[in-house]
Amino acid sequence: MSKTFEELFAELAIKSQTRPAGSGTVEELDRGVHAIGKKIVEEASEVWMAAEHEGNERLAEEICQEIYHLQVMMIKQGLSLDDVYKHL
């Protein structure tokens, strides 16, 4: 099922507040900024490799994963969507 950038952020924000058992998002938030940052860097390299070697379908998947980890970082640091939108 697809969702918008805003819907994903809302879902992740709810998970950060309700902390459902077994949630990968909660686990990532608990690991902290350093671990989240490492995931962002890892996913960025996977976006690049997908663009060069794996085609647009794989590229879209990797971009989605990058967006997920960026939003987790936003939530961890207390940034809202509006905090980011004002810089677009």
UniProtKB/Swiss-Prot annotation:
Catalytic activity: 1-(5-phospho-beta-D-ribosyl)-ATP + H2O = 1-(5-phospho-beta-D-ribosyl)-5'-AMP + diphosphate + H(+)
A GO CC annotation given for this chain: cytoplasm
Enzyme Commission number(s) from the entry: 3.6.1.31
Gene3D superfamilies cross-referenced by the UniProt entry: MazG-like
Intracellular or extracellular location(s): Cytoplasm
Alphabetical list of InterPro entries matching this protein: HisE, PRib-ATP_PPHydrolase-like
Domain of life: Bacteria
MF (Gene Ontology): ATP binding; phosphoribosyl-ATP diphosphatase activity
Protein name per Swiss-Prot or TrEMBL: Phosphoribosyl-ATP pyrophosphatase
Organism of derivation: Cutibacterium acnes (strain DSM 16379 / KPA171202) (Propionibacterium acnes)
Name of the gene this protein is made from: hisE
